Regions:
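N-terminal secretory signal peptides that target proteins for export/translocation
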Residues: 1-5
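Bacterial N-terminal signal peptides
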Residues: 11-21
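Structural microenvironment flanking redox-active thiols in thiol-disulfide oxidoreductases
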Residues: 75-114, 126-128
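Short, internal strand/loop/helix patches
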Residues: 96, 110-144
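Thiol-/selenol-based redox modules, centered on thioredoxin-like
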Residues: 142-173
Length: 173
């Protein structure tokens, strides 16, 4: 019985260790071309199609991936990005969050934690997550917590990965 319990604890620890470091194993590198994408998105509860190429005409874009709307870490991260919207705007930088959530969920998320300050895009077929190497190692259909700063010439300027939501905003400013 004790051995079985130890095996379960070890397995759980291994699972969460892999989960927390998965972003470091799969991500686009600085200087790489940022894959272009168009996706259904929500801003302040209204839907539209976000087009990365159009956003880049206005300046840099922070493309941040998060696992699931309304979970604790993703809610904190969205609130932090919402609080920093004016700082990003001063730098002529657009922020777009991307997850595998459906657009109805994201309409609510864009009003709640995002405060109507920035858009969130639905990647139902996970093509954007895959193109940006942003899938979790052990659950590739779910986005990892990873942020990219993309320059107007579609190059990756900066990458920040890590499951803690706290540093994504400050590191991408």
């Amino acid at each position: 019985m004790l051995l079985r319990k130890k095996v379960r604890l070890f397995s759980a620890g291994l699972f969460f260790s892999l989960l927390s470091c998965a972003a470091a194993w799969a991500e686009l590198k600085t200087g790489a071309n940022a894959p272009s994408f168009t996706a259904p998105a929500a801003l302040a509860g209204q839907t539209y199609h976000f087009v990365l190429a159009e956003a880049l005409k206005k300046g840099p874009v922070v493309v941040y991936f998060y696992p699931k709307a309304f979970t604790s870490g993703c809610t904190i991260e969205a609130q932090l990005f919402a609080e920093a919207t004016d700082k990003f705007a001063a730098l002529k930088t657009t922020v777009i969050g991307v997850s595998g959530d459906d657009i109805e969920t994201l309409k609510k998320f864009s009003q709640g934690p995002c405060g109507g300050k920035f858009a969130v895009a639905a990647d139902l077929d996970r093509s954007i997550i895959k193109a940006y190497d942003a899938g979790m190692l052990i659950m590739p259909s779910m986005a990892n917590r990873i942020s990219y700063v993309v320059t107007p010439d579609s190059k990756i300027l900066f990458v920040h990965s890590g499951m803690s939501p706290d540093q994504h905003v400050s590191s991408t400013l």
